[in-house]
Regions:
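PLP-dependent enzyme catalytic core of the Aspartate aminotransferase-like
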Residues: 118-119, 127-128, 146-149, 294, ...
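Conserved small-domain helix->loop->beta segment predominantly found in fold-type I
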Residues: 272-275, 279-281, 286, 290, ...
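Conserved PLP-enzyme active-site core in the AAT-like
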Residues: 2, 8-17, 79-311
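Short hydrophobic/aromatic beta-strand micro-patches
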Residues: 222, 345-347, 407-409
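Conserved N-terminal alpha-helix of the aminotransferase class I/II PLP-enzyme fold
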Residues: 38-90, 112-120
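Well-ordered beta-strand positions enriched in small/hydrophobic/aromatic, beta-favoring residues
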Residues: 151, 219-221, 318, 344, ...
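Glycine-centered tight turns that cap/initiate beta-strands
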Residues: 75, 147, 314-317, 364, ...
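N-terminal "arm"/small-domain region of PLP-dependent enzymes with the aminotransferase-like
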Residues: 2-60, 68
Length: 427
């Protein structure tokens, strides 16, 4: 039923379906365990023979209601909340990869994800090749190997604000028999639904726009249910061969389109944890209820500020896909017709110190490591989020030394413009 509803209605009423006499507002199930009357019923839960709850490290009714809402917003068959966006990306990859495997990823991605793929998962025996997402299909295909398991990209890159050609990435991935995983954090499903363009799996840092108020850290993995794992059974044995920890159960045979999500919860969440608290899920749900309203305001404010910066002689360049002269504008018209998000990147004429002086002069707009919530904030990635990367890696990730990431909130845009103008006057 939910898939027939508008995204606005799903934001408000999706996920939690109260029965007669139950709480109209999503309750917080602040409990580690759930009581059953007999041992057989509990045993069936452990054997995945029936649905239900027995330990919050795997599943919790509050968390599941919120995950169900996000799945409906994205148009997926199922979703799982994680304790951070980084955890979501790790789980999405590790659910189909093991030691000796390989992935391909866009080099236009968040610095933390770049480090996760380029350094951390290598310690688990999983290799990653980064590619320029703007390269030709033939060039990107050269990065694939016989042991490649996935292709990864961000709908709107952080912090470069480039727009991914999702259909192109999907064609490349599917031609090699692997799924495409898209981090859809910045546009959210309000402004883009990657599944409609061929994506197979979507991830989110729900800490950002979905929460919208910087009150909780979280993530989410959503599956479209469209990738045929059995058609590539040799490549994905974790899904298509018996799992000895569940008495020889095979996920694709037992759960069909829910195979990927079931394994994610029953195996990875069981063994690795990283589930958010029910209270954090409750806070996330409060944010989701106004997501459709806030995204419109974010985009409206950001468009006005980007247009101002584009015309100011002290600004060297601006990347915001809503600008007609932006290199990503054509892709934005296709994938983001109703707006992208409130995040933009720009550079000032001068040196790195010029950017620092501008940021230090801001009074209303805060310098924080966060991005994409109700309050406007600014960051210098080369000095902060991407400081672990070398100059060469910064260039590969599309992060110029002068790049300033501005996250436009939902305040009065005239107040924000006034703050930006006075800061520019101080450089």
């Amino acid at each position: 039923m939910e898939k027939k509803l508008s995204k606005a209605t799903i934001c408000v009423q999706g996920g939690w379906e109260p029965k007669n006499g139950e709480s109209r507002v999503l309750p917080i199930y602040q409990s580690t365990t759930f009581k059953y009357d007999n041992t057989e019923e509990m045993a069936d839960l452990f054997d995945l023979k029936k649905e239900g709850y027995f330990y919050t490290r795997l599943q919790n009714p509050t968390n599941d209601a919120v995950a169900k809402k996000i799945a409906a917003l994205e148009g997926g068959v199922g979703a799982m909340l994680t304790s951070s966006g980084q955890a979501a990306n790790f789980y999405a990859i590790f659910n189909i990869c093991e030691a000796g495997d390989h992935i391909v990823a866009s080099n236009e991605i968040y610095g933390g994800t770049y480090n996760l793929f380029g350094v951390t998962i290598k310690k688990l025996g999983i290799d990653c090749t980064f590619v320029n997402p703007e390269a030709s299909e033939e060039e990107i295909s050269k990065a694939f190997r016989p042991n490649t398991k996935a292709l990864f990209g961000e709908t709107i890159s952080n912090p470069g604000c480039k727009v991914l050609d999702i259909e192109k990435f999907a064609r490349i991935a599917h031609s090699h028999g692997v799924p495409i995983i898209v981090d859809n954090t910045f546009p959210t499903p309000i402004n883009c639904r990657p599944f409609e363009w061929g994506a197979d799996i979507v991830t989110h840092s729900t800490t950002k726009y979905m929460d919208g108020h910087a009150t909780q850290v979280g993530g989410c993995v959503v599956d479209s249910g469209n990738f045929d794992w059995d058609a590539h059974a040799d490549r994905y044995p974790g899904l298509t061969t018996p799992d000895e920890s569940y008495h020889g159960l095979t996920y694709t045979k037992a759960f069909g389109k829910m195979a990927y999500m079931t394994k994610l919860v029953a195996q990875l969440m069981r063994d690795l944890g990283s589930i958010p608290s029910p209270h954090n899920a409750f806070l996330l749900n409060l944010g989701l209820e106004t997501l459709h309203l806030r995204m419109a305001r974010h985009c409206e404010n950001a468009q006005k500020i980007a247009e101002f910066l584009e015309q100011d002689e002290r600004v060297a360049w601006v990347h915001y896909s809503g600008l007609k002269n932006d290199e990503a504008h054509t892709l934005a018209e296709k994938y983001l017709p109703n707006g992208s998000c409130g995040v933009m990147a720009f550079g000032l004429k001068g040196t790195r110190e010029t950017a620092v002086k501008f940021m230090d002069s801001l009074k209303l707009i805060s310098i924080v490591t966060h991005v994409a919530d109700a309050r406007s904030c600014v960051l210098h990635p080369a000095s902060h989020t991407h400081r672990q990367l070398s100059d060469e890696q910064l260039r590969e990730a599309g992060v110029a030394p002068d790049l300033i990431r501005l996250s436009v909130g939902i305040e009065d845009v005239n107040d924000l413009l006034a703050d930006i103008k006075q800061a520019l006057n101080n450089i």
